[in-house]
């Protein structure tokens, strides 16, 4: 049962995040320390250094041989349900590019959770040590599979947009060359015209593969889980110097991510940068669609009792901070994701307690 001491632990875990957010916001809005270009550089620092080390560090210390595979299967089914719902919605969208962009954002909003900061203390308070371990396992699986998948989709979108723009510019240049060739022919001059073609799928694959190969987020979780398997099987430990080097960088991950979010907020005209309609949509996707899909997946694989309850509650955890960093880095609805993170954490505590009470009543 949740007591006031447990509530305090959750609040104590989230207050430092808002402190970092406040510092980032004030450094731009009031103190004018950073320019827009410097804010982008801070976000890139977080995306390519702090977050990979953070992911690597917490993945290192998991035990892959104690994973609840039914819960993982339920998570996979829930994501498939969400993809099906979003795909059905996207078919009715009139603009293809807009549908793809909002499909990616909707997937982030409804599936990616802030498990380690809020989920771990809440699960421990509600159901004990085993529930905490289950939340950590699903968080590791999220880092390995869903965040990597999100990164891949964002890179594909970025590469496709870049090729489309380059192709359009090449076509325009070719058109000008044709006109110039006509004028030159009239004057008796020879001109070589440039040909513009549509970029091939293979060209897109090469660009995306090159970008992913250079992104440390691609390797962090895979290297971490590989070492975790070896360490738990062979009973070996990392050298203290190496672990200390990883730890000193990983500790900056969450704080710097919130600081970067504060920088972004300060550059917007309003606190709720995306507007109340999109903010409400984000909350519905996070706290309604996500838990509902997880309930379907959990029941489908036969989860029962407290394991089922923990699976549903962890799906209702607030928005992943990493999802904002990626959205900002790739220029995709960062205003929506920042609002979801900030206000999602504010409303998550009463909502999670509400989920807990309702699920206990329907035993």
Curated annotation (Swiss-Prot):
Cellular localisation: Membrane
Lipid bilayer topology: Multi-pass membrane protein
Record-level GO BP terms: auxin export across the plasma membrane; auxin polar transport; auxin-activated signaling pathway
Tissue expr: Expressed in leaves, shoot apex and panicles. Expressed in roots, stem bases, stems, leaves and young panicles.
GO CC, alphabetical: cell periphery; endoplasmic reticulum; plasma membrane
InterPro entries per UniProt: Auxin_eff_plant, Auxin_Efflux_Carrier, Mem_transp_PIN-like
Annotated GO MF terms: auxin efflux transmembrane transporter activity; identical protein binding; protein homodimerization activity
Ranges annotated as spanning the membrane: 7-27, 39-59, 72-92, 103-123, 134-154, 222-242, 246-266, 281-301, 307-327, 342-362
UniProt keyword terms in alphabetical order: Auxin signaling pathway, Membrane, Transmembrane, Transmembrane helix, Transport
Principal location listed in the UniProt entry: membrane
Described purpose of this protein according to its UniProt entry: May act as a component of the auxin efflux carrier.
Family assignment from sequence similarity: Belongs to the auxin efflux carrier (TC 2.A.69.1) family.
Protein name: Probable auxin efflux carrier component 5a
Record organism: Oryza sativa subsp. japonica (Rice)
